[in-house]
């Protein structure tokens, strides 16, 4: 309700130290009112800088860039121009602008970057999985509990790849 993604994290952090402009009051279920300041944007920053919580992982912008760069050079332009955010973690206000800024900084300067954040993206992962599961070709990849118990994880490779 109060969290957002900062377009410029360092600048937002500096501003929060010298001003209370980002502070918002929030009423807890028990009626207690708390003031939330820099936490509003610091929590979402972990998506871009996992090192803030001690994780050695690339941020979502770097992961997106690396994924595009592993694809055939002929389709990269289309991929850069069609980055679609999906899932509940993309519901933070400001995430599309920040992704666009970060991908633009990583991508070749000639690339046109377009990041789309559809309003229904919170459920798009579920919708996609549901469509996939309903395809007749997908049913041959289903794994019964007994099959998994007999073969272990290797059954996934045999049936799905």
UniProtKB/Swiss-Prot annotation:
InterPro entries named in the record: Actin, Actin_CS, ATPase_NBD
GO molecular function annotations of the record: ATP binding; hydrolase activity
Entries under Gene3D superfamilies matching the protein: 3.30.420.40, Actin, Chain A, domain 4
Subcellular location: Cytoplasm, Cytoskeleton
Keywords, ordered alphabetically: ATP-binding, Cytoplasm, Cytoskeleton, Hydrolase, Nucleotide-binding
Superkingdom per UniProt: Eukaryota
Catalysed reactions, as listed in the record: ATP + H2O = ADP + phosphate + H(+)
SUPFAM superfamilies: Actin-like ATPase domain
Record field: transmembrane: none
Function: Actins are highly conserved proteins that are involved in various types of cell motility and are ubiquitously expressed in all eukaryotic cells.
Similarity annotation: Belongs to the actin family.
Name this protein carries in UniProt: Actin
Native organism: Pinus contorta
